[in-house]
Swiss-Prot record:
<dbReference type="InterPro" id="IPR016161">
    <property type="entry name" value="Ald_DH/histidinol_DH"/>
</dbReference>
<keyword id="KW-0963">Cytoplasm</keyword>
<dbReference type="GO" id="GO:0050661">
    <property type="term" value="F:NADP binding"/>
</dbReference>
<dbReference type="GO" id="GO:0004350">
    <property type="term" value="F:glutamate-5-semialdehyde dehydrogenase activity"/>
</dbReference>
<keyword id="KW-0028">Amino-acid biosynthesis</keyword>
<keyword id="KW-0521">NADP</keyword>
<dbReference type="InterPro" id="IPR016163">
    <property type="entry name" value="Ald_DH_C"/>
</dbReference>
<comment type="pathway">
    <text>Amino-acid biosynthesis; L-proline biosynthesis; L-glutamate 5-semialdehyde from L-glutamate: step 2/2.</text>
</comment>
<dbReference type="InterPro" id="IPR012134">
    <property type="entry name" value="Glu-5-SA_DH"/>
</dbReference>
<dbReference type="InterPro" id="IPR015590">
    <property type="entry name" value="Aldehyde_DH_dom"/>
</dbReference>
<dbReference type="GO" id="GO:0055129">
    <property type="term" value="P:L-proline biosynthetic process"/>
</dbReference>
<dbReference type="InterPro" id="IPR016162">
    <property type="entry name" value="Ald_DH_N"/>
</dbReference>
<dbReference type="GO" id="GO:0005737">
    <property type="term" value="C:cytoplasm"/>
</dbReference>
<keyword id="KW-0641">Proline biosynthesis</keyword>
<comment type="function">
    <text>Catalyzes the NADPH-dependent reduction of L-glutamate 5-phosphate into L-glutamate 5-semialdehyde and phosphate. The product spontaneously undergoes cyclization to form 1-pyrroline-5-carboxylate.</text>
</comment>
<comment type="similarity">
    <text>Belongs to the gamma-glutamyl phosphate reductase family.</text>
</comment>
<protein>
    <recommendedName>
        <fullName>Gamma-glutamyl phosphate reductase</fullName>
        <ecNumber>1.2.1.41</ecNumber>
    </recommendedName>
</protein>
Length: 427
């Protein structure tokens, strides 16, 4: 039976107990066999499919709670589970099981002149705290990824997704038990009190090794401000697409519409379109027509309005806004130099795309823009661990330390050195 608490008068005591259980579970996980971890993952996927109706019923209750509120449609989309999304959740877990086990991998080795043989070996991080909002699928993705990398995980979902996340957690715990692994290897914080987040950020008496926030700007800002443990920061998307004068127009139009409108509520959705001034006469209106026909609202700069009047005027705030909605800001820039300047000023360093046939333009874009993911002639919606072949992701890390870009199994490991000698002593 899983621990369930409606509310606790002593959040710190509750959370510290969760931390101790996670730390205890992390020890046997660190050297659990690949076979046992994969067996647990397979059982988790089976349980999710077997309990699909229950998961969807609990998700329907979560959705009912937000009915009539003023939340964005993109928020509701992230919260919503369907039969297809539940099936994809299970398939994602199976894909993680099929990945190579990173734990114990020797990824560097060398010999010293004194005869010492040195190896750098991947090891689990230990206990990972994941704080997320409105995305019940993160429960499955984070639980499975952390397990594959030999880590215990403490999950703190938003109150909006608590029923869905609990239903998914039950499937994950069933998988752990089926493989004989510690059931506290994956835990969901059973209270909605925000003090639980504060307790996690303080490290739960040293039991949490790293925090991964997955949510809006206010959550990530709080985590970065208050955390006393390392953070894999997943900032807002604010993705840009630059259309160079050398771009193929048909390709550019298809990519821009997909990058913005495939799913507007994900962090890989394009929020700003930059068009080379040399291509404005030929490319701008067809690009805007494609977006408008797809149901997207255009926020245009004065330069754009001179060529295509009648659109809503963009404000300074628009250039730094992650809409997560069917809205895009558009401006004209002075070639690749102007695009680099604009992106460098407003980007969150998440994902940017260049649509161009000129290799020199692509090379400058890739060299001079310092975002975690850069794409050439491809939609920003590919900014996803599953699309990168990682099975799934905990988030897109936009910082520069350790993990960057999609945080998958390999990024959830650290390393240690193994040094083999034959009796050497240091002179």
């Amino acid at each position: 039976m899983l621990d369930t608490v409606a509310q606790s008068p002593d959040i710190d005591a509750l959370m510290n107990d969760i931390g101790r259980k996670a730390r205890a579970a992390s020890r046997p996980l660190a050297f659990a066999s690949t076979e046992s971890k994969n067996r647990a993952l397979a059982a988790m996927a089976d349980a999710i499919l077997a309990r699909k109706d229950h998961i969807l019923a609990e998700n329907a209750k979560d959705l009912k709670d937000v009915e009539g509120t003023d939340i964005l449609a993109s928020f509701v989309d992230r919260l919503t589970l369907t039969e297809k999304r539940v099936a994809e959740m299970a398939e994602g877990i199976r894909a993680i099981a099929a990945l190579p086990d990173p734990v114990g991998e020797v990824f560097a080795a060398w010999d010293r002149p004194n005869g010492l043989k040195i190896e750098r070996v991947r090891t689990p991080l230990g206990v990972i705290g994941v704080i997320f909002e409105s995305r019940p699928n993160v429960t499955a993705d984070a639980g499975a990824l952390c397990l594959k990398a030999g880590n215990a995980v403490i999950l703190r979902c938003g109150s909006d997704s608590r029923r869905s996340s609990q239903a998914i957690l039950e499937c994950l715990v069933e998988g752990l038990k089926a493989a004989g692994l510690p059931e506290h290897a994956i835990q969901l914080v059973p209270v909605t009190d925000r003090a639980a987040v504060g307790a996690m950020l303080r490290g739960l008496e040293g039991t949490i090794d790293v925090i991964v926030p997955r949510g809006g700007k206010s959550l990530v800002a709080r985590v970065q401000s208050e955390a006393r443990v390392p953070v894999f920061a997943h900032l807002e998307g604010l993705c840009h697409v630059y259309i160079d004068a050398s771009a193929d127009l048909d390709m550019a139009k298809a990519i821009v519409v997909n990058a913005k409108m495939r799913r507007t509520g994900i962090c890989g959705s394009a929020e700003t379109l930059l068009v080379d001034a040399k291509a404005a006469q030929t490319h701008l209106k067809p690009l805007l027509d494609g977006l408008t026909e797809a149901g997207c609202e255009i926020r245009a700069s004065t330069e754009v309005l001179r060529l295509v009047p009648g659109l809503k005027t963009a404000t300074e705030e628009d250039w730094s806004t992650e809409y997560l909605d069917a809205i895009i800001s558009v401006t004209i820039v002075d070639g690749i130099s102007g695009a680099i300047d604009h992106i460098s000023r407003y980007s969150s360093n998440h994902t940017e795309a260049v649509i161009a046939e000129d290799p020199a333009v692509v090379e400058r874009f890739f060299t001079e823009i310092d975002s975690a993911i850069l794409l050439h002639n491809a939609s920003t919606q590919f900014a996803d661990g599953g699309e990168f072949g990682m099975g799934a992701e905990i988030g897109i890390a936009t910082g520069k330390m350790h993990a960057r870009g999609p945080v998958g199994v390999e990024q959830l490991t650290s390393f240690k050195y193994r040094v083999h000698g034959t009796g050497q002593i240091r002179p």
